[in-house]
């Protein structure tokens, strides 16, 4: 994915040995495949950036969204514990209710207002339930050279339209 690709590239540029695995080759629904990859690579750390991210579509595919973001994350967290790997889980600001006008504190009340946010919160809870040492990073507005993202969309729309309407309430 977009974030994983950029992280692998940056870590390698800094001299780290990194084994990037795409979600096509590493389906989060298949514990046997995940176990085989982890056994083969023997990671010191796992950066879990894979996710079902189609926020609107998740409302129509809640089972698939939860399988990837919650159940898949739980499997990966259990494997990280079993193999003694440090764990970094990329989550989202969608775990919050979508109100307020300031950045959220780490322990702020979570109250997802959609299937996607609820599934990512279940992923966070799985990480906390299975691991004693972990990082959970809640991000939004991912952008980069690869993949679809807000910046690319805005650049394309700006070329196609005379004016644009864009949300202005994101902190």
Language-model features: locations:
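A structural alpha-helix within SAM-dependent methyltransferase catalytic domains
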Residues: 38, 74-77, 81, 128, ...
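NAD(P)-dependent short-chain dehydrogenase/reductase
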Residues: 125-171
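SDR active-site strand-loop-helix element
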Residues: 21, 46-50, 87-92, 97, ...
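Structural signature of beta-strand start/N-cap positions in the alpha/beta core
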Residues: 17, 42-44, 86, 133-135, ...
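N-terminal Rossmann/SDR dinucleotide-binding element
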Residues: 1-45, 82, 123
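NAD(P)H-binding glycine-rich loop region in Rossmannoid oxidoreductase-like domains
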Residues: 31-68, 79-81
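Short glycine-/acidic-enriched loop or helix-start segments at secondary-structure transitions
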Residues: 5-7, 57-58, 97-100, 146-147
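Catalytic helix-loop patch of NAD(P)-dependent Rossmann-fold dehydrogenases
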Residues: 60, 67, 72-75, 95-137, ...
């Amino acid at each position: 994915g977009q974030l994983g690709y950029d992280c692998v590239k940056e870590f390698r540029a800094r001299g780290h040995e990194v084994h990037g695995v795409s979600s096509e080759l590493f389906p989060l629904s298949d514990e046997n495949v995940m176990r085989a990859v982890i056994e083969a690579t023997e990671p010191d750390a796992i950066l879990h950036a894979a996710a079902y991210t189609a926020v609107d579509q998740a409302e129509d595919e809640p089972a698939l969204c939860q399988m990837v973001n919650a159940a898949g994350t739980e499997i990966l967290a259990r494997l990280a514990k079993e193999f003694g790997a440090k764990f970094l889980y990329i989550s989202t600001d969608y775990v919050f209710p979508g109100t307020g006008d300031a950045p959220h504190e780490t322990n702020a009340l979570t109250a997802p207002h959609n299937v996607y946010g609820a599934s990512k919160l279940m992923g966070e809870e799985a990480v906390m339930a299975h691991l004693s040492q972990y990082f959970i990073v809640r991000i939004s507005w991912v952008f980069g050279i690869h993949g679809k993202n807000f910046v690319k969309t805005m650049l394309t729309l700006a070329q196609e339209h005379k004016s644009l309407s864009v949300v202005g309430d994101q902190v």
